[in-house]
Amino acid sequence: MKTNNHNAKQAQTKTAKSNPSKEVTKIKPKRVKNKPTAKAAKSTGLKTNAANESSDVEVIKTAKSGLHERNAHRGRYDFKKLIAAEPQLKSFVIKNPKGEDSINFSDPKAVKMLNKALLAAHYDIEYWDIPDTYLCPPIPGRADYVHRVAELLDGEVKGKYAHHKVRALDVGVGANCIYPIVGVTQYGWHYTGSDVDPKSIESARTIVERNVSLNGKIELRQQTSESNIYRGIIQPNDRYDITTCNPPFHRSAEEAAMGSQRKLDNLKANQRKKGVKVQAHQAKTPQVKANKPALNFGGQNAELWCEGGEAAFIRKMANESQAFSAQVLWFTTLISKKDNVRPMRKQLEKLGVKAIRIVEMSQGQKVSRFMAWSYMDKAQRKAWIELK
């Protein structure tokens, strides 16, 4: 189910600048109230009956600049360290116009090998692989989402959250299993990963089984119904502190293919502008045919598109979340399209959530965001934490 890779290559190509992550704006909690009827508003200007009582939704918006301070990928990639962790990366390293070590980011094999090296060097992952044509995630940005939701949990307590007790659910874990890997290795979380694609579950399970650090920390569950998200995955006795999701972005396979081609063209144009030879690495490793852009960016149907696209997916996610309101402290999802934020917020307010967080994350020119919501008010969230 993972997608949002329409900006993935840009995020992978550029690591964060070395300046510290900082909060750009912070809006104080906003109490969202149901409007009084037109008649009442006209006659008194005030709410006059129980039907018009406040929905009392606490909405906080924040904007974060740069990668999180706990993100291991701030600054440029240390290729000496990466090659030491994964020697096979060496054959893919080239020089950029500034004479600095880099790779050809239009070569999927080079990007995949870079990911292996990053996971080995920073997360002690001894084995990581994904099937051909599956989504190869830009790890710095993916890791930042996990660090930001961890920060959300930390905001619930004085000091730090008891992360070693956290139970997390990743909707659409994908073949790469990236969010559980980061959550387990960086915070000691216990993760459940779900996916509709059997091959993704098989790949993720192999990654877990072949890494001692992940054994017993990640459970994979097959979603047997393409029409469900949480249903069939969250069991009656489950309790999750946090959920994560990178929802399908496109509305059709054709739209996904066009998006992949557009990203490939933009990437090559950007490389040429910088003086990088797009085919510079051909002599060292076979290049994917130009008429198969999906291989350069990766992604299967369930990862890239669904009927109605991102808007329809997160709308269904919101609706389903209501049935599990007492079993999850904070639901979260990435939202790629800014235009989808307001409708999602309005829908959540109608569903009766008590708190909403909208966190915008920017790294260079790339801007992403996630939305978090809870059906518990502050006192109820405190009680949840005290029972852990």
UniProtKB/Swiss-Prot annotation:
Family annotation (SUPFAM superfamilies): S-adenosyl-L-methionine-dependent methyltransferases
Q: Which GO terms describe its cellular component?
A: cytoplasm
Q: Which domain of life is it from?
A: Bacteria
Region Disordered, as annotated, extends over 1-51
| Function in brief | Specifically methylates the adenine in position 1618 of 23S rRNA.
Looking up HAMAP family in the UniProt record yields:
23SrRNA_methyltr_F
User: What is the official name of this protein in its record?
Assistant: Ribosomal RNA large subunit methyltransferase F
Origin organism is: Vibrio campbellii (strain ATCC BAA-1116)
Traced from the root, the source organism's taxonomic lineage reads: Bacteria, Pseudomonadati, Pseudomonadota, Gammaproteobacteria, Vibrionales
